[in-house]
């Protein structure tokens, strides 16, 4: 599934992501835009360390999910393939786990590059939140 920006914003708001970990809803949606283009089936790799990135939030197989290609910390306790379906509830749960680590949203390189310290005040202005 490819979400629209506003569709994803409403979904994430319903899952209490606005303010989660100290990050505004706009930060979460911005991160998803630049990580996956809002596509739940986004799959990328092979990364330099042999890992792959899965789904809407491009969650990494070395740290967050298990893909049977290599050993994993599997901190979200989930098979990576589950992060490629249209149900994003488990993706959201895993993203919440990621942001609890000291790096916070800086775990996502695309967020650092495109969203961090940017003025996102108008980013969701059209979404009727």
Curated annotation (Swiss-Prot):
Its cofactor is Ca(2+). Its EC number is 3.2.1.17. Gene3D superfamilies: 1.10.530.10. InterPro entries: Glyco_hydro_22 (IPR001916), Glyco_hydro_22_CS (IPR019799), Glyco_hydro_22_lys (IPR000974), Lysozyme-like_dom_sf (IPR023346). GO terms for molecular function: lysozyme activity; metal ion binding. It comes from the Eukaryota. SUPFAM superfamilies: Lysozyme-like. Binds 1 Ca(2+) ion per subunit. The active site is at 35, 53. Ca(2+) binds at residues 82, 85, 87, 90-91. Disulfide bonds join 6-127, 30-115, 65-80, 76-94. It catalyses: Hydrolysis of (1->4)-beta-linkages between N-acetylmuramic acid and N-acetyl-D-glucosamine residues in a peptidoglycan and between N-acetyl-D-glucosamine residues in chitodextrins. Residues 1-129 form the C-type lysozyme domain. Keywords: Antimicrobial, Bacteriolytic enzyme, Calcium, Disulfide bond, Glycosidase, Hydrolase, Metal-binding, Milk protein. PROSITE patterns: GLYCOSYL_HYDROL_F22_1, GLYCOSYL_HYDROL_F22_2. It is an enzyme of class 3 (hydrolase). One of its GO terms (biological process) is killing of cells of another organism. Coiled coil: none annotated. Belongs to the glycosyl hydrolase 22 family. Lysozymes have primarily a bacteriolytic function; those in tissues and body fluids are associated with the monocyte-macrophage system and enhance the activity of immunoagents. Lysozyme C is capable of both hydrolysis and transglycosylation; it also shows a slight esterase activity. It acts rapidly on both peptide-substituted and unsubstituted peptidoglycan, and slowly on chitin oligosaccharides. Monomer. This is Lysozyme C. It comes from Equus asinus. The gene is LYZ.
């Amino acid at each position: 599934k490819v979400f629209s920006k506003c569709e994803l914003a409403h979904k994430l708001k319903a899952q209490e992501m606005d303010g989660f970990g100290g990050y505004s809803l706009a930060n979460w949606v911005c991160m998803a835009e630049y990580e996956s283009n809002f596509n739940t089936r986004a799959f990328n790799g092979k990364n330099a360390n042999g890992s792959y990135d899965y789904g809407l939030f491009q969650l990494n197989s070395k740290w967050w999910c298990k893909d049977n290609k290599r050993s994993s910390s599997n901190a979200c306790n989930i098979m990576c393939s589950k992060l490629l379906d249209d149900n994003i509830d488990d993706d959201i749960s895993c993203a919440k786990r990621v942001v609890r680590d000291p790096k916070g949203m800086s775990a996502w390189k695309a967020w650092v590059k495109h969203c961090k310290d940017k003025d996102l005040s108008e980013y969701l202005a059209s979404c009727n939140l």
